[in-house]
């Protein structure tokens, strides 16, 4: 399997759904002036008003527009995971991450405020907005199962004097700062920006969610190995085949060893039927000549004498290539 995923989201229905949800829900909520229902705080929404439904929906909409754009880019980079796990398992992983991160953040929030948050200045009041918990849970899977393709080094040197000598060069080499950066640098930068945009709540919720991802992968939080979301296989399928998909599938089938073996067997059967003296006459392959060829007199000088009969699909493609 190639390390580089295909361009676009044609074969990535779950990634497409996640990106559309991340972009459309904040837009519709902003137009309808309902963005405030996705804001989650311990006081007053949970402690005073007991609006626990906010725990179920606070990850579906980012309050800040910058977080919305960053989350959409991160979902696009996560298409590696959908290609690796498959659409159905990837969707199950997202749902499990949503459930476990919500329960984990809420439970630790209650414990924190029950013992430490009695003092107002130590109370954990704000939660993260948007799908930051789900994304931080999936970061573990991305780091664990996505190989690094390339890396490069960046050296930062101090200011150089007017006259440099050999000793000065040695001193500069010792004082140089070298950074090693790999191809996951873009994802790391986006994750860092997303966490810093949300302050202390982003750091705390992000760490809890990252730990939830580790526990899901190690099997401490069950569900990923033995359970799949029911009744969604039809909706996450690729849909009706397009002209490009049919052409790619036909070309791949022609190039397989099984297809070549079938063509050779059919060619051999046709040759035996033409040279035999008894028995029924075998029908020629489509595209081959019905006139028997005298191979003994033709010899090897005739071009295409040893060329096997071409299937109909190959002839059809050759017609348009000419």
Swiss-Prot record:
One of its GO terms (biological process) is protein ubiquitination. Residues 41-54, 112-120, 211-322 are cytoplasmic. Residues 269-322 are annotated as: Disordered. Residues 1-19, 76-90, 142-189 are extracellular. It is a multi-pass membrane protein. The keyword Transcription does not apply. The chain crosses the membrane at residues 20-40, 55-75, 91-111, 121-141, 190-210. One of its GO terms (cellular component) is Golgi membrane. Keywords: Membrane, Transmembrane, Transmembrane helix. It is found in: Membrane. Residues 287-298 have a biased composition (Polar residues). SUPFAM superfamilies: Rhomboid-like (SSF144091). InterPro entries: Rhomboid-like_sf. The keyword Membrane applies. Component of the DSC E3 ubiquitin ligase complexes that tags proteins present in Golgi, endosome and vacuole membranes and function in protein homeostasis under non-stress conditions and support a role in protein quality control. Component of the DSC E3 ligase complexes composed of at least TUL1, DSC2, DSC3, UBX3, CDC48 as well as VLD1 for the vacuole-localized complex or GLD1 for the Golgi/endosome-localized complex. This is DSC E3 ubiquitin ligase complex subunit 2. The gene is DSC2.
């Amino acid at each position: 399997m190639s390390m580089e995923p295909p361009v676009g989201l044609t074969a990535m229905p779950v990634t497409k759904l996640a990106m559309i949800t991340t972009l459309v829900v904040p837009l519709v909520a902003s137009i309808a002036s309902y963005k405030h229902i996705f804001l989650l705080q311990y006081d007053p929404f949970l402690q005073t008003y007991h609006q626990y439904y906010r725990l179920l929906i606070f990850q579906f909409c980012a309050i800040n527009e910058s977080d919305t754009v960053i989350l959409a880019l991160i979902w696009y980079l996560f298409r590696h995971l959908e290609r690796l796990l498959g659409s159905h398992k990837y969707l199950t992983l997202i749902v499990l991450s949503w459930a476990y991160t919500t329960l984990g953040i809420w439970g630790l929030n209650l414990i924190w405020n029950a013992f430490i948050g009695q003092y107002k200045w130590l109370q954990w009041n704000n939660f993260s907005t948007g799908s930051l918990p789900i994304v931080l849970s999936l970061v573990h899977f991305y780091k664990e199962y996505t190989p690094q393709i390339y890396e490069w080094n960046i050296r930062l040197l101090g200011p150089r004097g007017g006259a440099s000598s050999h000793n000065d060069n040695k001193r500069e080499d010792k004082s140089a700062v070298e950074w090693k950066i790999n191809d996951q640098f873009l994802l790391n930068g986006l994750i860092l920006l997303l966490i810093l945009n949300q302050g202390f709540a982003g750091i705390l919720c992000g760490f809890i969610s990252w730990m939830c991802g580790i526990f899901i992968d190690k099997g401490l939080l069950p569900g990923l190995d033995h359970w799949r979301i029911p009744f969604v296989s039809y909706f996450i399928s690729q849909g009706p085949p397009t002209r490009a998909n049919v052409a790619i599938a036909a070309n791949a089938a022609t190039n397989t060893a099984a297809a070549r073996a079938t063509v050779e067997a059919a060619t051999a059967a046709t040759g035996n039927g033409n040279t035999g003296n008894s028995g029924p006459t075998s029908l020629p392959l489509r595209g081959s000549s019905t006139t028997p060829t005298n191979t003994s007199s033709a010899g090897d000088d005739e071009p295409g004498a040893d060329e096997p009969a071409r299937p109909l699909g190959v002839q059809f493609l050759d017609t348009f290539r000419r």
